[in-house]
Design a protein with these regions (language model features):
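Glycine- and charge-rich intrinsically disordered segments
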Residues: 1-23
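Domain-level recognition of nuclease-like catalytic cores that cleave nucleotide substrates
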Residues: 2-4, 113-149
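Hydrophobic transmembrane signal anchors and adjacent membrane-proximal interface regions, especially
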Residues: 4-8, 27, 37, 92, ...
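Compositionally biased, intrinsically disordered low-complexity segments
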Residues: 15, 45, 114-117
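Catalytic centers of nucleases
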Residues: 17, 24-103
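Conserved beta-strand segments of the P-loop GTPase G domain that flank and frequently precede/overlap
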Residues: 84-85, 110-113
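Short glycine-/polar-rich loops that comprise or flank the Walker A/P-loop
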Residues: 105-108
Length: 149
């Protein structure tokens, strides 16, 4: 810790201790931009995977879907689930997110990019990406996979 000097009547006094490396506070805009960029990355991957160019972010395509907490718009039904993306350090609250989603006719898949602080808490990097899906939906995917074999 460094100390801030002040002069009072030719006498040096130490007022307070200041941290050498103050933590940088990230703004809400930073988090929003990070999340938007992650949505676009997932859209690009899904377009390549399905060959469907109509997949887009719900922000760009449907305010109604966006308000229902669904991040990826799929008007052609090329994806068997709704998608919510998260790029956070903390584990997403799956129960809360499922309760907030406005549509229930397809299962919800939460695609989570785990963020991790590194090197003095100033840099944040990805520590893996995971898809969180309901168990019943996982069993449907497994059955479909085995039926094709």
């Amino acid at each position: 810790m460094a100390k801030k000097k002040t002069k009072i009547d030719s006498e040096v006094k130490y007022e307070q201790e200041l941290p050498l490396n103050p933590k940088k506070k990230r703004s809400g805009a930073y988090s929003k931009n990070k999340g938007n960029a992650y949505e676009l990355k997932i859209v690009k991957e899904l377009k390549e995977l399905t060959g469907n160019d109509n997949i887009s972010t719900s922000r760009a395509n449907s305010k109604k879907l966006d308000d229902m907490k669904i991040d990826i718009s799929d008007p052609d039904n090329a994806i068997p689930c709704y998608i919510q993306t998260k790029k956070t350090q903390s584990t997403p609250s799956v129960k809360k997110i499922n309760a907030e989603v406005g549509l229930k006719d397809k299962p919800l898949c939460i695609i989570w990019n785990i963020q991790e602080k590194k090197e003095g808490n100033t840099n944040i990097t990805s520590n893996g990406e995971y898809a969180i899906i309901p168990k019943d939906f996982f069993y449907e995917l497994l059955k479909s996979h085995n039926d094709k074999r």
